[in-house]
Amino acid sequence: MPAMQLVAIRQFLGGILYVAYFLFQKTPWPKAKQWKTILILSLLNFVLSNGLSTWGVKYISSGLGAILGAIFPIWIVIITFFRGERLSKLAVTGMLVCFGGVCIIFYDHLKDFLEPNFTFGIILSLIATLTWAFGTLYTKKKAASFNPYFSLGLQMLISSLFLFIVIGATGTTIPLSEIPANSWWSIGY
């Protein structure tokens, strides 16, 4: 099953469930100015981060994927530093120790960084973690004024529509009837 189609279906179904729950609870819709934030977060956290991450792991080993995913907090430190904000030395040390721990656990996969066949997957995964970091920082800055879970559902729904457009335009889909059972189980999970 095409990875982006899997992501689009998973986010669509998850978004529908979240949004339906909050509509049933009569949660007020976000205000007009909040939709810009929701749209930006949809693109950063779901279309780019989740979509590119899922696409990227098709081209790399799982251990390398774990190492690349663990780079996410380091991006936070780097971005925060260049914004002129301060992080405590303890926080930075903790992130580096955790990243080092992941590298120790997946030590055998460090050599995969040198594998030419993995270059595309590495690039996709790095962009995914970088957009995840920007999305996280943007969430911290902008998203506190409305229900984060309702926003999450809307982000999932909006991002799935973007992804359906992309996979439709690129022809990277298969009919729903041809999706294997294990893919449906992973979507449900």
Where are these regions (language model features)?
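Cytoplasmic-side transmembrane-helix entry/capping segments in multi-pass membrane proteins
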Residues: K33-S42, L87-G100, G121-I122, F146-M156
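Residue-level signature of transmembrane alpha-helical cores of multipass secondary-active transporters
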Residues: I38-S42, T54, A66, M95, ...
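Residues that mark transmembrane-helix kinks and helix-interface sites
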Residues: V19, N50-T54, I74-V77, F106, ...
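Hydrophobic transmembrane alpha-helices of multi-pass small-molecule transport proteins
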Residues: Y18, L39, I71, L87-H109, ...
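Transmembrane alpha-helical segments that form core, pore/gating elements
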Residues: A3, Y18, I76-F82, M95, ...
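Membrane-interface helix-cap regions at the ends of transmembrane helices
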Residues: L13-K31, G100-E115, I158-S183
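Specific alpha-helical transmembrane segments that line the substrate/conduction pathway
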Residues: Q5-I16, N45, N50-K89, A128
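Specific transmembrane alpha-helical segments of multi-pass solute transporters/efflux pumps
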Residues: V19-G69, I104, W185
